[in-house]
């Protein structure tokens, strides 16, 4: 918690360095240090695209900050989210995100309380299945599987997912 962090702030002396955003978010610094970038997501789609800023039909939840710089230039880009929202009524692993802040090319690992999906080197079809099996809430897995199989069956190119 924030209170616990500040209560022990002296313990972190020499372990945490705070720098201006111009330095800490600089792509060259991030790249050279091979930083592990950990960011939050509101929702993740079956291709691996991440929405970090918008809810529903466009309501802005927060700003993107430096997460784009970190995701694109880090050694490993990790995004975490809950598997559901609204007390389990809504899946945070969805066929298509409402808004794309980070493309599938910038995301490598997705984490929910259900598990971890390592998307590196996978095809779109494989990414979808890894996200469903490892990150989606069990209640939503059948519908997500059905979506992927229908999209794949209708696709002329059997390497990707199409919109229905």
Where are the model-predicted features located?
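Conserved phosphate- and dinucleotide-binding cores of soluble alpha/beta proteins
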Residues: 1-164
């Amino acid at each position: 918690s924030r209170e616990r962090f500040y209560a022990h702030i002296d313990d972190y002396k020499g372990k945490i360095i705070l720098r201006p955003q111009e330095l800490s978010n600089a792509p060259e610094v991030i790249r050279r240090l091979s930083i592990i970038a950990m960011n939050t997501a509101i929702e993740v789609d079956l291709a691996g695209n991440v929405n970090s800023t918008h809810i529903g039909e466009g309501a802005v939840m927060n700003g993107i900050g430096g997460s784009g710089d970190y995701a694109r230039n880090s050694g490993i880009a990790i995004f975490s989210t809950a598997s559901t929202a609204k007390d389990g009524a809504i899946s945070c692993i969805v066929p298509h995100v409402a808004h794309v802040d980070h493309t599938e090319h910038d995301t490598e690992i997705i984490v929910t309380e259900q598990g971890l999906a390592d998307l590196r080197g996978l095809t779109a079809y494989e990414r979808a299945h890894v996200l469903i099996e490892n990150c989606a809430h069990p209640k939503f897995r059948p519908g997500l599987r059905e979506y992927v199989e229908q999209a794949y069956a209708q696709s002329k190119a059997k390497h990707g997912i199409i919109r229905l």
